[in-house]
Amino acid sequence: EISKYIKDDFGFNYSGYFRSGWATTPRGGPKSWAIGSLGRFGNEHSGWFDLTLSQRVYNNNGKTAKAVVTLDGNVGQRNNDSWFNDGGDDLLKFSDMYLTTTGFVPGLPDTNLWVGRHALQQYELQMLDWKAHKENTASGVGLENIPLGTGKLDVSLNRQDLRNCARNTDGSANCNLTDDVNTNSVDFNYHDIPLWDKANLTFRGRYNLANKTSDNKRNERDNDF
């Protein structure tokens, strides 16, 4: 009841995931194995977390606005005095930091308009450790849940700067030397297309557009990158 009251009246919501625990061996401390690989559950001795906080900042006449922040990271399990960015196991990043609104798009009262660091909805099957294609999580703007035919359309424009590796004389890549390229990507999801009972279809797509500087073009022309 308290949680529902805070969510409905104050507009604050929390969701997330974290893991922690204790392990030991008869010969030194436990060692992680195949971190991030398929089927590695139980072999990662770390405290990974994924926490999302949201706060409603506007609510009037069917129009709402909400600020959302998502933190991803890891907390080391080996000692109690480690700090982030000290070269150890402690890691932290802001995966999301954006404002999302509903009711502000004329003629589309249920469509979400967002701006900031965010990406279109992503899917994964936790128990199978299977992850689908993920859009870029970078600064951008997007629309979600646009009614279109029998389904709904999501579309976003995101920034995705890339680092091009230098080209060796034999054509192989030399990633010790890189060239930054500003890139924008257009992502779309056409989802919730009904097929049969409890089954639907989703189409995903992406188009990248490089915004090359004169140096980028010269390096490409000279086959340096």
Where are these regions (language model features)?
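Beta-barrel outer-membrane channel/assembly domains of diderm bacteria
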Residues: 1-108, 113, 146
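Outer-membrane beta-barrel domain signature
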Residues: 3, 38-42, 80-90, 126-132, ...
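Transmembrane beta-strands of outer-membrane beta-barrel pores
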Residues: 20-26, 57, 71-77, 117-121, ...
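Extracellular beta-strand-rich solenoid/capping regions of secreted or surface-exposed proteins
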Residues: 92-95, 133-137
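Long, hydrophobic, well-ordered secondary-structure blocks that form the structural core
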Residues: 114-135, 162
